[in-house]
Design a protein with these regions (language model features):
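Secreted/periplasmic carbohydrate-active enzymes, especially glycoside hydrolases
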Residues: 1-11, 21-337, 341-347, 384, ...
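Substrate-binding/catalytic cleft of secreted carbohydrate-active enzymes
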Residues: 328-444
């Protein structure tokens, strides 16, 4: 039975003010992707043919200019019995304000910042039949202090919000790199596929891929079995050589992309498809504080830029910036996925940035003098930084990651954020322009 959270509103207000830490477990950080039922739909991003996909456009139930809860938006979704063997995820972006999520009257997340597209695992909170999903706009002072100077996106409210379900035995995350071999003769695909078995029983799945060169030629394909115990995750690693690849090295002057399709099979039956564009690119940094591509320093002409209201306008503006000699864009916060797709295709570098901007008290290094040194905000900092990284990691245009806009102070939270990104083993630079000689930046 659906349960509206609008009716017991006082309960909602109290829960938002004192959310249990366990609720935060619904939110996850991983590569942004959808599972398509057909290969052609995957290639063309045709979502209307995805059987278990629901667009989210909730209606306003409550609004106020005062208090901790400023608005409540609700939508009733119907979960059929056929979803029992699937994991359901809620993707949110373009909410317009900081918010939290309720499902059937139960709060499942801490407050989420309005700037970072997010994903939540909602299966444990759904019932068979009608369910009420609520997006509750909140006014939490600490949220605004973490992101003081970041403008709200100009896109339509709730655009690209959706629920989709993927099989309980399926791909959970993917890390893709196309890197040169040790002698720079050709490329090697580094494809790490994290597989999840949410069943209690032992299961076997087939995971496959095929990769096509920029000219459309099939380069390689493979299908492997993976036996998994119940309630477990494992990673399949593929490392095939990709020959005749040096002419396809990705750069603004040569933005060539390979097409990679991941898919899963069970008992010979194709289950799900996931498409990716992959660029042959290797980035790092040297001891002179320069970002490098294939070991050579890049000469960057950088511009601050956030995506426009829609994809077509953004592509037009990015092309115009490139025509003026700009070769690197620096957004102030994570962008819609199509922004990175555009930059991959058009050929322009991007230094991505977490949704952190706290100039107030930036010079105060006492505890809580700056948000960056308020330990009770650590979880919010780490989630913003990790989500930024996971969403952008597979794009050829991404040459480095910024912990925060500067100045945003420095301290415990940004130290831990730097350590977190370093733990992922990425060769790309981690930058914080407000480090002021401290150790939590690779480039000063």
């Amino acid at each position: 039975m659906k349960k509206s959270i609008y009716l017991p509103f006082l309960v909602v207000a109290l829960m938002v003010a004192a959310v249990d830490a366990a609720f935060a477990q619904a939110r996850i950080a991983r590569t942004e992707f959808l599972c398509y039922d057909k290969r052609e739909d995957a290639k063309r991003d045709i979502r209307t043919q995805i059987d278990k996909y629901i667009a989210i456009a909730p209606t306003l139930q409550f609004q106020s200019d005062e208090g901790g809860v400023r608005a409540v938006y609700e939508q009733v979704i119907t979960v059929p019995a056929s979803w029992n063997d699937y994991n359901a995820y809620l993707h949110t972006e373009n909410i317009g304000n900081d918010y939290t999520i309720f499902v059937n009257g139960r709060q499942i997340s801490r407050p989420i910042d309005k700037h970072t597209p997010s994903e939540l695992f909602i299966s444990p909170y759904l019932d068979q039949g009608d369910n009420t999903v609520a997006i509750v706009v909140v006014a939490e002072p600490y949220m605004s202090t973490i992101a003081e100077d970041i403008a709200t996106s100009p896109r339509t409210q709730f655009s690209n919000c959706y629920i989709f379900a993927q099989r309980k035995l399926g791909i959970y995350d993917v890390n893709i790199r196309l890197l040169p071999d040790s002698l720079n003769r050709f490329a090697q695909l580094h494809l790490d596929v994290e597989v999840d078995n949410s069943f209690s029983t032992d299961e076997t799945i087939e995971v496959g891929y095929d990769i096509y060169a920029p000219d459309g030629k099939l380069i390689d394909y493979s299908v492997n079995d993976l036996a998994m115990t119940g309630f477990s995750r494992d990673t399949m690693r593929f490392k095939p050589w990709v020959y005749h690849s040096n002419p396809n090295r990705w750069s603004p002057a040569n933005p060539k992309l390979y097409d990679l399709m991941l898919y899963t099979k069970r008992n010979g039956i194709l289950w799900e498809y996931m498409p990716f564009k992959v660029g042959f690119a290797e980035y790092g940094y040297n001891d002179k504080g320069q970002i490098t591509a294939f070991g050579q320093p890049l000469q960057l002409k950088e511009s601050r830029y956030n995506a426009a209201a829609d994809r077509a306008t953004t592509e037009k503006e990015v092309k115009a910036l490139k025509a003026k000699g700009i070769n690197c864009l620096s957004p102030t916060h994570p962008q819609p996925q199509w922004f990175y797709d555009i930059c991959d295709k058009v050929g322009i570098y991007v230094i991505d940035c977490a949704a952190i901007s706290s100039p107030t008290g930036a010079d105060d290094r006492t505890i809580a003098g700056t948000s960056a040194n308020a330990p009770w905000l650590l979880e919010d900092y780490l989630m913003r930084v990790e989500t930024m990284y996971r969403r952008a990691q597979n794009h050829a245009c991404i040459i480095a990651f910024r912990l925060a806009n500067a100045p945003s102070g420095n301290g415990y939270n940004l130290y831990k954020a730097y350590e977190l990104l370093k733990s992922f083993g990425d060769t790309r630079a981690i930058i914080y322009d407000g480090a002021e000689g401290e150790w939590n930046t690779d480039i000063e």
